[in-house]
Amino acid sequence: MSTLEQKLTEIISAPVEALGYELVGIEFIRGRQSTLRIYIDSDDGITVDACADVSHQVSAVLDVEDPITVAYNLEVSSPGLDRPMFTAEHYTRYLGEEVTLVLRMAMQNRRKWQGIIKAVDGEMITVTVDGKDEVFALSNIQKANLVPHF
């Protein structure tokens, strides 16, 4: 997680939790049209109204704190079926589930991996890929998503 994303998480978590939702994670995607994407969840699921409420509250806080120096779009959504994974707790919650990982730095000449989450030990996760256990540092994971099965 970048320094900006850490700061944004600190700023955003209080208003999200005050509304009764879990802040699953955030992504700040830089580009011609930069986007701040906020993922929220709750035991009862997420509605469009919930996303609108969080967007309104977070937008007000971001206007005051002003941590982002470029123009951006704010998106608030549920994690969806291909839920993004941001923390060790997320991996622990989904032990035994299939995940796709994109690494910052390649391991064994690969940046993209897919397998079953086997274990979490501090800041390291073990994923079984093609029958072999591979260990990944959370700090080297650029993006991770659950693989939905229908």
Curated annotation (Swiss-Prot):
It is found in: Cytoplasm. CDD domains: YlxS_C (cd01734). This is Ribosome maturation factor RimP. Its main location: cytoplasm. It comes from the Bacteria. Keywords: Cytoplasm, Ribosome biogenesis. InterPro entries: Ribosome_maturation_RimP, RimP_C, RimP_C_sf, RimP_N, RimP_N_sf. The lineage of its organism: Bacteria, Pseudomonadati, Pseudomonadota, Gammaproteobacteria, Enterobacterales. GO terms for biological process: ribosomal small subunit assembly; translation. One of its GO terms (cellular component) is cytosol. It comes from Yersinia pestis (strain Pestoides F). Required for maturation of 30S ribosomal subunits. Pfam families: DUF150_C (PF17384), RimP_N (PF02576). PANTHER family: RIBOSOME MATURATION FACTOR RIMP (PTHR33867:SF1). Belongs to the RimP family.
